């Protein structure tokens, strides 16, 4: 879970706008606090909840991915330094091999993530259209 989620729930927001926070320290994804209008319909609430769930799912994926990357990179660097001697630094070429291998190992997981990300976002198109129609008529009545 995002490190911002517990502290950001206490923030008093201007309800006219969505708020975008700083990048999470682990996932590197910015926390988005979606606005909640006073007269939010059930349709709008469901759409907002679906977007919040998608944002959390995305942040969780990248947090897990980045933690795995950091752990494996540390292990790689430690192993290389034992081979080279403590005073030597791991070269950029050696690190590029690690990056290549890491991405190759994660290829299937990344493809699954991309497919799911597109599926979830495409599923939000119809609810977004319905919510925007509701908001258009609400604004037209003013």
From Swiss-Prot:
Gene Ontology CC, one term: mitochondrial inner membrane
Chief site of localization: mitochondrion
Positions in coiled-coil regions: none
Keyword Transit peptide applies: yes
Keyword Mitochondrion belongs to the record: yes
Mode of membrane association: Peripheral membrane protein
GO BP annotation list: intrinsic apoptotic signaling pathway
Keywords: Apoptosis, Membrane, Mitochondrion, Mitochondrion inner membrane, Transit peptide
Localization of this protein: Mitochondrion inner membrane
Pfam families from the UniProt entry: COA8 (PF10231)
Known role: May be required for cytochrome c complex (COX) assembly and function, COX being the terminal component of the mitochondrial respiratory chain.
Protein family membership: Belongs to the COA8 family.
Protein name: COA8 family protein CBG23705, mitochondrial
